[in-house]
């Protein structure tokens, strides 16, 4: 499967630079996303495209307010394209956009006593599952989504205590 990850950051601080650099090393981020898509049995004859933006609490709050009518920062916002006409425009299939607040990831890692890395990959996995159609509004759907998150994270060696 060919995957195009449009990865960017609008962070104005160097605080997370080392972590961001590790995402680029050996295509680590792209390989992680590919494996998640493979675990979810996503196939395509055309390249798949995914946009990922790393930001801070202030910027994600603006997006959350504008698109979800929630005036508060959040960890991740996903925009799925599979239900729109924009899904297969051009030479690839667009999965969607994922926006992650690294500040919120750091806060949650501390709150849940996880490593920053584990919390980042949890939030990223959560965002990927949303663009693949998973949701957690209904209790049954929430249970299924949590099971998939834990199974995916476990396949990478990320457990609740790591």
From Swiss-Prot:
Q: Give the cofactor note text.
A: Binds 1 zinc ion.
Entry GO MF terms: metalloendopeptidase activity; RNA endonuclease activity; zinc ion binding
| GO cellular component term of the entry, any | cytoplasm
Which family is annotated?
Belongs to the endoribonuclease YbeY family.
Q: Does the keyword Magnesium apply?
A: no
Which amino acids does the record list as binding Zn(2+)? 126, 130, 136
| One record GO biological process | rRNA processing
Q: What does this protein do?
A: Single strand-specific metallo-endoribonuclease involved in late-stage 70S ribosome quality control and in maturation of the 3' terminus of the 16S rRNA.
* Location of this chain's protein in the cell: Cytoplasm
Know the name of this protein? Endoribonuclease YbeY
From the record, what ranges are coiled-coil?
none
Cofactor(s), by name: Zn(2+)
Record-listed E.C. numbers: 3.1.-.-
Q: What is its main location?
A: cytoplasm
Q: Does the keyword Cytoplasm apply?
A: yes
Q: Which UniProt keywords apply?
A: Cytoplasm, Endonuclease, Hydrolase, Metal-binding, Nuclease, Ribosome biogenesis, rRNA processing, Zinc
């Amino acid at each position: 499967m060919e995957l195009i990850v449009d990865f960017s950051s609008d962070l104005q601080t160097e605080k997370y630079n080392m972590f961001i650099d590790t995402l680029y090393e050996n295509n680590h981020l792209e390989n992680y996303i590919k494996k998640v898509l493979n675990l979810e049995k996503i196939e395509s004859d055309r390249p798949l495209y995914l946009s990922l933006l790393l930001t801070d609490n202030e910027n994600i709050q603006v997006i959350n307010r504008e698109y979800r009518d929630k005036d508060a920062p959040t960890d991740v916002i996903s925009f799925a394209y599979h239900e729109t006409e924009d899904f297969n425009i051009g030479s690839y299939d667009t999965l969607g956009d994922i926006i992650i607040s690294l500040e919120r990831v750091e806060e949650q890692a501390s709150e849940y006593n996880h490593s920053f890395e584990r919390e980042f990959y949890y939030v990223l996995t959560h965002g990927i599952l949303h663009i693949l159609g998973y949701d957690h509004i209904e209790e049954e759907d929430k249970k299924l989504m949590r099971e998939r998150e834990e199974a995916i994270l476990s396949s990478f060696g990320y457990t609740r205590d790591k």
